């Protein structure tokens, strides 16, 4: 198993280290355009192997040829958000970056699975799919796992319970229009609505929607990377080990939820072939309308890029 990570920034480097430590691949390649950065970080990771107890070969490069024959490619390249910048502000700039990255990746790997982390996530997943020519089930966006992790962590904090006992789904686009589905949220099987008042739940939902920008506002000069990297690696682990995990991921819908040919976050089964099944769960009218409205925003942004791809 060979996994390439594009982008040696905080998210990419953190993800590469987690992949190595979990020994999900025999070889991890970290690629970045800045000379020396991927090489130095990769060497540092590799040298941690004897004490972190892994044998994964970690290599850094500025040459996409070193990504040849990758089974999975994690794409984290792109500009990060700055304070006051929405994900949509990044649209045109990151489209050009992802178009170039995907073209380079496909030049050297025949049928990889692409995991997208770059923002605006849903639209960049569409761009990568369009440019790569891969089957839609092999181009997957990370957002839902991250948004759900934030939702679960805030619930655990409010209840002072283990995060492992929180089960939840956050659907829709990765942005202000995401849809945390409260009725499917439970704590060790107990519905969340039996444990927290509506006002508290509403506040947690709102905080989840603003989870990324909350971190941006704290950091001033950067954005989240620990949770995004962990979320991406959770997806990769399910694929590598063919675990068939049910995770909320950005995938291309084909009529499910009344949404067609749009990349949107929904529950999927992740296995060795990528998205092996899209689960269409029952939503009430308000939830379904919110999901469709979220998808409509993604679709509008994708259409605006027609001339740029």
Swiss-Prot record:
CDD domains, A to Z: LDH-like_MDH (cd01339)
Binding-site residues for NAD(+), renumbered to this chain: 7-12, 32, 94, 117-119
Molecular function as annotated in GO: L-lactate dehydrogenase activity; L-malate dehydrogenase (NAD+) activity
Chain positions recorded as substrate binding sites: 81, 87, 119, 150
EC number of the protein: 1.1.1.37
Keyword Transferase (UniProt): no
PANTHER family from the UniProt entry: L-2-HYDROXYCARBOXYLATE DEHYDROGENASE (NAD(P)(+)), L-LACTATE DEHYDROGENASE
Function: Catalyzes the reversible oxidation of malate to oxaloacetate.
Name used for this protein in its record: Malate dehydrogenase
